[in-house]
Structures are given as structure tokens and as C-alpha cells.
Swiss-Prot record:
This is Complement component C9. Residues 42-95 form the TSP type-1 domain. Residues 99-136 form the LDL-receptor class A domain. Membrane attack complex (MAC) assembly is inhibited by CD59, thereby protecting self-cells from damage during complement activation. CD59 acts by preventing incorporation of the multiple copies of C9 required for complete formation of the osmolytic pore. MAC assembly is also inhibited by clusterin (CLU) chaperones that inhibit polymerization of C9.
Length: 547
């Protein structure tokens, strides 16, 4: 069986890690001890604060509360907002500051642009108001030169959330060009792309590298650490993960509306990501009741690199309006809602591409019984193949169906018969709807033959839907324009909000696990990852060795 796909990319890293309990004995549960099983703990929140004074400009008042204890041991998790608002009639007048564009043109969005940008065919205003009332044909900056819009450039600068959630929107208007026609050539496809104003540099680079790594872990928590290591290395964070927004009300209540800071479009590229909450909970649900081995397959494809401008960046009208809508007096709920929408940090530079990451849950006992080794499974899935760039950037993966047959003394074992691979957990990021949904559909149907062919298919779609795969981060509050009203105060408030955000959802609000278990907080619920010799919702049940 073979599959071939042609696609352009910069770096292809196929990394295989083995996360395993090692050569540990099998255990069976001892008789249940009811006294050791903790009762469910429901989410507990503090009382609401008093309502704030009525903000004269926003015509709203606010209140907040805190999470005291997260749900744990099958109790109700914390899913409600910590902030609240309501309309009010102010008793003071609002001191509004009108935008003055001077000799420049004022857009319908309020943006100020140079008059030389009028009637050039570009959407410099963001609402095309600069292209109204044009008597003559547009004067496009690129004239007769052929250029295309870059999906890498559109994605550049996207934010990251310190607790792991993908931001709902981007602050940058990367479809603004300031009347320039800076072209960047993709050496793979020989296509010229137009570089947006916000990017100081954009490079399509072509490199190829492969790295195979095998590691063994004796406890599940060590496997979990390896999966979330990137986020922890960025922020020195504890085991707290939050993937579901609870404060960004606009995007929750109006799912059909665009939360991207730009107009919705039928042609908008879909960037796929599986539900991280469900994925991590599924991963943690595999206890050490039976000896498991986790085959961690990671393929990183880098398409290019970018560096954002350090000053004079053009931000989306939505981002600026949301900053203006923040109360000058600190209100925890409102500022956390802003962080959940745009991220706690943005990418000042980084790499774009896709992350192909799967975790195969292997049944170690069945492998031993049938004489199947780890390298046999790797060979069957095709992850021992060389993936190297050839002429015209063709990547071909050839899988022999006989590689999935293992002969032992008694029989011929089919590795794909279902008894060796318990599950496939996906952490894939990037790629278009077509290949991402095909793979998701395959997993939902219980397929356990996700292999290198699926990797090649997915990789071929990344040019159209890249995501950030590595970045240098800067706090989101650094983007507040210094000339905006109350800019200094709101910057200080956002600094405070990031600290409050970390403390509000800290794992310290969980009860400890028993017998050396590690507590992990995911989306308002505390879970226990148990050592090899224990199991249960609190690691309260010991396992006796099976002779």
C-alpha cells in the first residue's frame, strides 16, 4: 500500500517518544475500602461583591466573585463566570475623546489613514470606506505584478493563553498593507506573496530534518508532563489547564458571529484543533490498572518564519473597541474576559506550520503475550519510514501491508486486529477542514490504523491553514496604544488581571490526592494521576501484585 502527496514545507520533524510504565508487575484491585473513597466535592464560589458605581461612558456596572474550591472526585466542576455586568443610568457625564485625524482621512471605522491610500483597491480602512466615492479606476499598489495573500502572514502574531486555551481572536489587522507592495517569494511553489504592513519580516524557508526519540516513563504523570512541556517551559506553570472560555460572553452567546476581529467570510480558512479538554481527560482516564504503553508520535512541519513590527502596528477595530470598552477601574471579570478573547500574550516572532501529534495507547500485556515488540508496531504504522524532501518537494510514504504481520512460534499475529492498540488520542493542530475532518471521522469510528499515510495527507493541506508552532511571546498589554484614553491605567489593570487569572484557576484550590498522586486541574475540575501501585478517583485504592 502506498500514498504520495506533493507539498511545500520548511521543516519536517517526525518525533517518536515512548511513554510507558516500564517493566512493572501487573496489579489487581484489593477489596474496595469505602472509608478511603472520598465523597464528591462540588464547585464552590464566593459571594458576589457589591455592584460597582455606574461607569458613565460604558453605562454599565460590574461585580465579581472568586472560585474557592474546584469540583473534584466526581463532583460538579466550575463552569460559571467570575464576573457579571448590568446596564445602569450614570449620574456623571462621560468625558469622551473624539478621534481627530487632522489632515488624514477618517474611515467609517474611526481609523485614520493617509489620503494617498484612497481609491487604491486595498481595504485600508477595514470597511472599504476608503474605496467609496472613487471617480477613476483604482490604482493598485502592485500594478501588474502578480501577488497572492499569504495565509502564513494572516496567522502571524496570533496570541497564546497562559493556561493553555487557544485565543478566540487576533489583535492584528494583517490585511493592511499601507499602500506598499512588498513581495515575498516561496521558493517551493515559486509563488509571490504580499507581505502585510504589520510584519517586519516574513520568510518561506525550505529545510528538512528528522528526529526519532524514544523515552520511557514509569508513571502516567511523567507522560502527561511530556505532552504539556511546551506550555510549562514558556510560563513555568503548574498543572492547571483551561481550554473553555467562561468569561468571553460575546463569543459564547453568539456562536454564529465572527470572533476574529475581522469580517466573516465564506472563504475563511478553517484551522482545525480537537477539543483539548476531552483529549486530556481521555488521556488521564487510562490508569495503570493494566500495564500500558503510550506511543507518542509527533510530527512538526514548519512552513516559514515571521517577525512582527515593534511599533506602528495596525490593530483591528474590534481589538481597539474592546480596549475602549474595558472599565478604567479594575473589574476582574471584564479584564479576564479580554484575556480569554485575545490571549495573555501575543507572538512577536515565531514559526508557522502544523503540529501532528498522536498518542497510541498500547496494551503491554497483549504485546507480551503475542510476542509483539514496540518496533513492530512502529513499522506497521509506518513511523520508521524516511520522510525526506525530493525534487519538486514530493514526499512519498510506502507502507507494506506485510509489515503489520508478526510471526511467532505459534501463529501469525495481525498487529491491527484491535487487541494491541487500545485507543488513538489526537492532539493535532493545523490543516484544512477536509483532511482534519477525515481523520477525526476515522478516529470517531474507532479506527486504530492512523498511520504515516494520514500524516502525508494532512501535511499537504498546511499551506492553506497554518498555525503557530513556536513563538517568542510578549504580554498582550504592550499593544495598548499609548495615545488612547486611560491607556496607562488599563495597561496596569491587564498586568494585574494576568496575575489574578493564574491565581483564580490555580491547582492550589484542589484537594490533594492520596498515596503520592498528582492533582491536575482541567476546566474547573480536579483530577488525580496515580502512581503505578494505586488507582481510584483519589488514588485511594492499592493494587496487589498478581503472582
Amino acid at each position: 500500500m502506498s500514498a504520495g502527496r506533493t507539498f511545500a514545507f520548511a521543516i519536517c520533524i517526525l518525533e517518536v517518544s515512548v511513554l510507558t510504565a516500564g517493566p512493572t508487575p501487573n496489579y489487581a484491585p484489593e477489596p474496595e475500602q469505602q472509608s478511603g473513597t472520598p465523597l464528591p466535592i462540588d464547585c464552590r464560589m464566593s459571594s458576589w461583591s457589591e455592584w460597582s458605581e455606574c461607569d458613565p461612558c460604558l453605562r454599565q456596572m460590574f461585580r465579581s466573585r472568586s472560585i474557592e474550591v474546584f469540583g473534584q472526585f466526581n463532583g460538579q466542576r466550575c463552569v460559571d463566570a467570575v464576573g457579571d455586568r448590568r446596564q445602569c443610568v450614570p449620574t456623571e457625564a462621560c468625558e469622551e475623546v473624539e478621534d481627530d485625524c487632522g489632515n488624514d482621512f477618517q474611515c467609517g471605522t474611526g481609523r485614520c489613514i493617509k489620503k494617498r491610500l484612497l481609491c487604491n483597491g486595498d481595504n485600508d480602512c477595514g470597511d472599504f470606506s476608503d474605496e467609496d466615492d472613487c471617480e477613476n479606476d483604482p490604482r493598485p499598489p502592485c500594478r501588474e505584478r502578480v501577488v497572492e495573500e499569504s495565509e502564513l502572514a494572516r496567522t502571524a502574531g496570533y496570541g497564546i493563553n497562559i493556561l493553555g486555551m487557544d485565543p478566540l481572536s487576533t489583535p492584528f489587522d494583517n490585511e493592511y498593507y499601507n499602500g506598499l507592495c512588498d513581495r515575498v517569494r516561496d521558493g517551493n511553489t515559486l509563488t509571490y506573496y504580499r507581505k502585510p504592513w504589520n510584519l517586519a519580516s516574513l520568510a518561506y524557508e525550505t529545510k528538512a530534518d528528522k528526529n526519532f526519540r524514544i523515552e520511557h516513563y514509569e508513571q502516567q504523570i511523567q507522560a502527561f508532563r511530556s505532552v504539556i512541556e511546551e506550555r510549562r517551559s514558556h510560563f513555568n506553570a503548574d498543572f492547571t489547564l483551561k481550554f473553555t472560555p467562561t468569561e468571553a460572553k460575546k463569543c459564547k452567546q453568539e456562536p454564529e458571529e465572527s470572533c476574529n476581529g475581522t469580517d466573516s467570510s465564506e472563504n475563511r480558512i478553517f484551522r482545525f484543533a480537537y477539543s483539548k479538554n476531552e483529549t486530556y481527560q481521555l488521556f488521564l482516564s487510562y490508569s495503570s490498572k493494566k500495564e500500558k504503553m503510550f506511543l507518542h508520535v509527533k510530527g512538526v512541519i514548519q512552513l516559514g518564519k515571521f517577525v512582527m513590527r515593534s511599533r506602528d502596528v495596525v490593530l483591528t477595530t474590534t481589538f481597539l473597541d474592546d480596549i475602549k470598552a474595558l472599565p478604567t477601574a479594575y473589574e476582574k471579570g471584564e479584564y479576564i474576559a479580554f484575556l480569554e478573547t485575545y490571549g495573555t500574550h501575543y507572538s512577536s516572532s515565531g514559526s508557522l506550520g502544523g503540529l501532528y501529534e498522536l498518542i497510541y495507547v498500547l496494551d503491554k500485556a497483549s504485546m507480551d503475550q503475542k510476542g509483539v515488540e514496540l518496533r513492530d508496531i512502529q513499522r506497521c504504522l509506518g513511523f520508521n519510514l524516511d520522510l525526506s524532501l525530493k525534487d519538486k518537494y514530493e514526499v512519498t510514504a510506502k507502507i507494506d501491508k506485510n509489515d503489520c504481520l508478526k510471526r511467532n512460534e505459534k501463529e501469525i499475529v495481525n498487529i491491527m486486529d484491535g487487541s494491541l492498540i487500545d485507543d488513538v488520542i489526537s492532539l493535532i493542530r493545523g490543516g484544512t477542514r477536509k483532511y482534519a475532518f477525515e481523520l477525526k471521522e476515522k478516529l470517531l469510528k474507532g479506527a486504530k490504523t492512523v498511520n504515516v499515510t494520514d500524516f502525508v495527507n494532512w501535511a499537504s493541506s498546511l499551506n492553506d491553514a497554518p498555525v503557530l508552532i513556536s513563538q517568542r511571546l510578549s504580554p498582550i498589554y504592550n499593544l495598548i496604544p499609548v495615545k488612547m484614553k486611560d491607556a496607562h491605567q488599563k495597561k496596569q489593570n491587564l498586568e494585574r488581571a494576568i496575575e489574578d487569572y493564574i491565581n483564580e484557576f490555580s491547582v492550589r484550590k484542589c484537594h490533594p490526592c492520596q498515596n503520592g498522586g498528582t492533582v491536575i486541574q482541567i476546566d474547573g475540575q480536579c483530577l488525580c494521576s496515580c502512581p503505578i501501585a494505586f488507582e481510584g478517583i483519589a488514588c485511594e485504592t492499592g493494587k496487589k501484585k498478581i503472582s
